Regions:
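Juxtamembrane helix-loop-helix connectors linking adjacent transmembrane helices
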Residues: 141-237
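Functionally important transmembrane alpha-helices
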Residues: 239, 260-324
């Protein structure tokens, strides 16, 4: 039987997902994370795999498929409670189940889904969007879920939880136009992403050096380390952040404020999201991240592709990691 394009895409998505998990497992084994987790390595990897799954498979059409299958408001509101399962997968073997946390990680998706459901037919940003995005932004920015995965090496898991929930709310329930969340490789996405990276690079290096934020250092990592770093940056940093700040936030803001104002405001909020990185208020990082956000937003806006802005974001972060 000849496979259709959709079936081939699903097969590749599953195969690549398995490869990603193997690469991540190998990278963790070489790092100090494995030692710090001790006997909790397997539950941590399983929890990570479950939280990564929505971010990955929504990029290959899972969100649209769920939108067709979950027809009743009740089923759409109840389904995302499954996002709480990865917490139990990690906490139960560790004997560290916190019932207050369990209630939050299972109930928060249901409550926010119900709020979004009431605005699903609206094609512009409404007060429900402000409530939902504010809640998601607050949960992540204030690191409210960090104690639930209490290891430094697992800091990305709360981000994946929030990202998966945001995707579900705006792709499955809200079905908002123009999010552009697809991980299927496209030539124009790569060209748009690399173009904005080239535009930002001299400005970012010049301003970063002037502010004393970056300092040049030569670094040539092993090929395996470089590939692992690029993959990690793309999947765990660029994609979730670009999906939220560009595909959802900037997209919604455009419906009320117009393209240019939305671009600047989304970039400013993106910059402010980095205020607690390192210093108590890292104003240098906020300035540079805000300016970078302008170029990320331009990359997304060119063809409404999260992949494009994720490529720009990844390229910026990898250059910073390698040489600054």
């Amino acid at each position: 039987m000849k496979l259709t394009t959709e079936q081939t895409r699903k097969t590749w998505a599953i195969a690549l997902y398995a490869c990603i998990l193997l690469v991540m497992r190998a990278g963790i084994a070489r790092s100090g994370i494995a030692a710090s987790l001790a006997g909790q390595l397997r539950p941590a990897l399983l929890s990570f795999g479950l939280l990564l799954a929505p971010l990955w498979f929504f990029g290959f059409g899972l969100g649209e498929w769920l939108g067709r299958k979950l027809r009743s408001p009740w089923s759409r509101a109840a389904f995302p409670a499954l996002l709480g399962v990865p917490y139990l997968v990690f906490a139960i073997p560790a004997g560290n189940v916190r019932w207050s946390t369990t209630v939050v990680v299972f109930l928060l998706p249901v409550v926010l889904s119900a709020v979004v459901e009431s605005s699903a037919s609206k094609r512009k940003m409404v007060w429900q969007d402000v409530v939902v995005l504010g809640a998601l932004f607050g949960v992540y920015l204030l690191r409210l879920l960090m104690p639930d995965w209490p290891h430094a090496g697992l800091a990305v898991l709360p981000k994946l939880y929030v990202a998966g929930l945001a995707l579900y709310l705006y792709v499955v329930i809200r079905k908002f136009d123009g999010v552009g969340y697809s991980l299927v490789p496209k030539r124009d996405a790569f060209l748009s992403g690399l173009r904005e990276w080239v535009y930002f690079l001299p400005l970012g290096i010049g301003l970063g050096a002037a502010l004393g934020f970056i300092h040049f250092h030569a670094s040539v990592p092993f090929t395996a380390s470089l590939l692992s770093g690029v993959l990690t940056t793309f999947l765990l940093v660029a994609v979730p952040e670009e999906m939220f700040f560009r595909g959802i936030l900037q997209n919604l803001l455009e419906t009320r404020l117009g393209q240019n104002t939305a671009l600047v405001l989304a970039a400013l909020l993106f910059g402010l999201a980095h205020f607690n990185t390192g210093a108590s208020f890292n104003w240098r990082y906020v300035i540079l991240a805000t300016i970078a956000g302008i170029f990320y937003g331009r990359a997304w806006r060119a063809r409404r592709q999260v992949l494009a802005s994720s490529i720009t974001h990844t390229a910026v972060d990898v250059v910073w990691w390698l040489w600054f």
